[in-house]
Swiss-Prot record:
Organism whose genome encodes this protein: Erwinia tasmaniensis (strain DSM 17950 / CFBP 7177 / CIP 109463 / NCPPB 4357 / Et1/99)
Residue positions binding [4Fe-4S] cluster 2: 387, 416, 419, 422
Gene behind the chain: rnfC
UniProt cross-references to PANTHER family, sorted A to Z: ION-TRANSLOCATING OXIDOREDUCTASE COMPLEX SUBUNIT C
Cofactor: binding details: Binds 2 [4Fe-4S] clusters per subunit.
Name this polypeptide is given: Ion-translocating oxidoreductase complex subunit C
UniProt lineage: Bacteria, Pseudomonadati, Pseudomonadota, Gammaproteobacteria, Enterobacterales
Main localization, broad class: membrane
Amino acid sequence: MLNLLNLFKKDRLWDFDGGIHPPEMKTQSNGTPLRHLPLPAQFVLPLKQHIGHEGEIGVRPGDQVLRGQPLTFGTGRMLPVHAPTSGTVSKIAPHMTAHPSALAEMCLFILPDGEDRWCEKRPLEDYRSVERSELVARVHQAGVAGLGGAGFPTASKLKGGLHGVNTLIINAAECEPYITADDRLMQDHAAEVLEGSRILAWILQAERVLIGIEDNKPEAIAALKKALGSATDLHIRVIPTKYPSGGAKQLTKILTGKEVPHGGRSTDIGVLMQNVGTAFAVKRAIIDGEPLTERVVTLTGESVAQPGNVWARLGTPISHLLQHAGFIPGAEQMVVMGGPLMGFTLPTLDVPVVKITNCILAPAASEMGQNEAEQGCIRCSACADACPAALLPQQLYWYSRGGDHDKARAHNIADCIECGACAYVCPSNIPLVQYYRQEKAEIQAIDLEAERAALAKNRFEARQQRLEREKAARSAKHQQAKRSVASSDAGAIAAARERVAARQAEGVSPENHADNSLQAAVQAQHEAEVRVHQADLQAANEPVTRQTLDPRKAAVEAAIARTKAKKAAQAAEASPTEAPQQSAPEDEPRKAAVAAAVARTKAKKAAQAAEASPTEAPQQSAPEDVPRKAAVAAAVARAKAKKAAQAAEASATEAPQQSAPEHDPRKAAVAAAVARAKAKKAAQAAEASATEAPLQPAPEDDPRKAAVAAAVARAKAKKAAQAAEASATEAPLQPAPEDDPRKAAVAAAVARAKAKKAAQAAEASATEAPLQPAPEDDPRKAAIAAAIARAKARKTQQPSMQED
């Protein structure tokens, strides 16, 4: 008894609410076998022929392709598109595709070469010898999608049902009027359909396979039973004819008695459904190694002279199919892609065949009836009685028409399968399906925008978090750097203190200090001389901006220059004398040497500034200056030269006085030679300054003033010579410390270098003076100047000869 109940339950069929029984009109096309059509002049292949994203293009215009060659590639829901024949890719451009909106999409255009050559195939006879994932990958690479009308990628559907599916349903109902593509396919290729069903069952590891077919297809039922024979792995279930029994949820309810939950999928209840055409395409992809390049299309309608089913290559224009079917267009002729209830009218016949194209309907005007105008809803509830999804079409109509998206969503408009049963029974001729499709599209756009906004928000928040993390990382890095620097500074300070303590404990010899101080003094003197030389060059290159000057202003500027020179000379004289008074007996020799070098540099700069200041006034003065100003300028120049010589001699004698407490004969001799050289240079500088004044233009000089100026110059030169003699004799009297010959040699070399530089400077100053213009020189003044120069030279030579 229990076995009889199980057998009864296994063969039992259920029913769904609603549904209609429209005229079938299938006998127009199911009586002739499948036939092939010649190739069109051009193929148009849309990149997107399925639910999902379009793949990446793998060819370029001008490429030669073979049949079955992939033109695009991708993963997941990005199904590839294959070349329907061999030929050349002519272009890649937008073109109108099979969609109710008639929008243009990106398409590949192929010009066939007529050879129809296949690419290399990869057949697999024993599919049970490979992994199931490999079979799913092959299905994806073949570009197989749902051929029943939805166009969902088959590989993605199989991958989602690899676990938990115990029932596989092969949908052979084909309930919509006029369409006979699956019917004719089962009649002509029943064995291949069953083999594809077995491959799908093997991939899913399904416990049972149910083939649901309506009872209005006796030839197809007979062909399937004949091909099945005595096999028990597949079960053929003949169901009553009722529209829309071919819907996924409706057929699942009929064969299993289970209902797919709202918002869920059939896999949630352990059921997965595939179309008859999809099973045939899977067999071709696995066993034969052929990708999806063609499908069965029904050509029917009273406007077609030769209705039937044909093998149509993907990308074939609809006009090419109708042309070979004897299409006779009438007045206001319409052509529908799909059935009369779920199809849509084509905007043009250039639309290509795609993977979801199952029927081309070209009805006559009498066949479709008159196009009656839409009227107001009378609330008859006939649409609710006919709805197979148990919805409220009337309420959905009001919400869709009023744009109330929230209410439409709340009334489960997403569960509408757009079967058209409500519109078929509506007495007011309201195109309800049109409203529902538009409302679904608007809701989808709103959801997409919300998803993009959420994604943008998440990206913004992620960016903010990343910036905060980077900021915290930088702050931590800076803190670590500060700590490391502080620790390193502390270590360096401690190490320096230890070195100082060790040096103080061990003691440092004075000889090393002397060597270091001598080197530092030489370096400081060299740097000072370089700076002075650069200053001279800069002063020489500066142009004279004032061409004319008032005599009164010239006198004022000369007085200011004399005052500045006097202060500079006093500072230079005071700087070397202060150091010995302030320095303690314990000062290091290095400090004394550095102070002496600094004093010499300052004295030299002061002397150069003094020489430059009196010479500027005569250059800037007009040729109309009086002779008295020239005499005054000469006297000022001689006075500044004398002060500069005294400062140089004082700076030269200070270093030995401070750093030589004990007498050394060799150092004394070197110091004496240095003093004589400096005295000689000072005398030469005095003579040059004395001779510069007469060379300046003095058109009306007075003999008395010239004599006075000469006497003053002789007296100053005599004082300079006496000062030089005194400085030369003082050096040997100073006690010299015990020093080694190396230091003496270094000191002598330094003295010779300084003397040489001073001589060169004196020669340069002497040669520059004659170059000055003296257009109105007096012979008497020239004679007086020559006598003064000879007297000064004689006085300078006498002390030096006595010392030698």
